Amino acid sequence: MAHFNQNFLDSIERDLPSHLSMEDFIAYSNKPLRLSIRVNTLKISTENFIDLMSAKGWSFDPIPWCNQGFWVTISSDLQLGNTIEHLQGLFYIQEASSMLPPTALFDSHADNENDLSQFAQTRVLDMASAPGSKTTQIAALMNNQGLLVANEYSASRVKVLHANVARMGVSNCALTHFDARVFGEYLFETFDSVLLDAPCSGEGTIRKDPDALKNWDNNDNKGIVDTQKALIESAFLALKVGGCLVYSTCALSRQENQDVCHHLKTAFGEAVEFAALTELFPDADKACTEEGFLHVWPQIYDSEGFFVAKIRKVSAVERTLPEPKMQKNFPFTAAKTKQIEELTAYFEDSFAITLPTDAEIMVRDLEFWLFPKAVMPLIGKMRFQRIGIKLADALKKGYKVRHEAILALSSPTRFELSDEQAKEFLMGRDISLVEKVKPQGEVIVSYASNPLGVAKHLGNKLKNNLPRDLVKDKIALYQ
């Protein structure tokens, strides 16, 4: 049972549209959320995923605003986060409403979704990324093309963000760790698209946490609103002319939503154009405000409360701060031609993996990395925590592939494991082989034709090379 205080209910009653009722708001706020997931199309098609999981007792109800999103019913009480398919990165457990902002950001590309190269030169900024649901959704919509800068202010949450980015096989991402208010200064008019899923009071999340609003006080929100206004200004400054900014929160009040967008309009005048989201998906108009924003109340779609606004930058704005000095001592250098040839041959010969040609192979000490080409002009303008994916380490003789490279780069050559073998592998154990054959060296091990990681084939067993931090104590199997 959700715990409301009267101040919160009074605030909701002021902001709730006249065609919606407080009774429904309270009733839906007391209902548990429907379980929802998003298929990761960087690894598996939506159709193949449905076939795979339907055979394991799942049923699917499409989420109307995300082609890869579904409310799901499962026939067991398994912890989905401990299933093999989740650990492989085939899906993300994501609340349905939170799939709206990336959909709004990319809706103009929906008609060209089969053009897999349309984002090759695109730069996208996700200003507040952790834990990574929207970041990985954006990467999938971009088909790992172009550059996705994912920023997170909290140091501990950066680690979670990277873990999810790696699990989902994202390779076009650069991670940063800043107060996002710096982007307008450091990367002025750099990005084609910007997502600001702003820190907020979290009023829309009460269906996840009944105590979320127990001590709600509108006076506590002033500092949050000031931060939101500063962040949306920074986002707009970082946006190219002609680009789109999506501002979203899981708050319900006008103060944190419409008022913040109107603040931007006041600050930048005719350079700001509100883009209507009335036709983003069937029945979107049920949640639309007079400006064309989506103000999703829990009872409209039986989901979390959410707010989404899409804003176009239709003309240039003045840069008020000078361009910062270039940062020095970047620790990476471009790989030499011979190194690239050797590394390319290693991946092709060992794993039948062809390294992408639309990326840069970079070297730091004995490490080889794959950088998105679109990040190269930004080197020195901002400090990055991590760029692209780590491909391999150089040994005295040859190379040793990195786990994240196997998850991100597709290969037709795999050693397929059974349910029980996959469970053993993810628990860090070696896999005994019934038939002794000639040792094959490093091999990609897979489950349901999707990679799990790398093992060393010794003839009579597969020696587990799963990174220790990914070893699980418990794996959930379907009976």
From Swiss-Prot:
Catalysed conversion reaction: cytidine(1407) in 16S rRNA + S-adenosyl-L-methionine = 5-methylcytidine(1407) in 16S rRNA + S-adenosyl-L-homocysteine + H(+)
Molecular-function GO term, any one: RNA binding
UniProt key word Methyltransferase: yes
RNA-binding keyword on record: yes
Alphabetized UniProt keyword annotations: Cytoplasm, Methyltransferase, RNA-binding, rRNA processing, S-adenosyl-L-methionine, Transferase
EC number: 2.1.1.178
Positions of S-adenosyl-L-methionine binding: 128-134, 152, 179, 197
CDD domains: AdoMet_MTases (cd02440)
One cellular component term from this protein's GO annotations in UniProt: cytoplasm
The protein's role, per its UniProt record: Specifically methylates the cytosine at position 1407 (m5C1407) of 16S rRNA.
Record-given protein name: Ribosomal RNA small subunit methyltransferase F
Species this chain originates from: Shewanella halifaxensis (strain HAW-EB4)
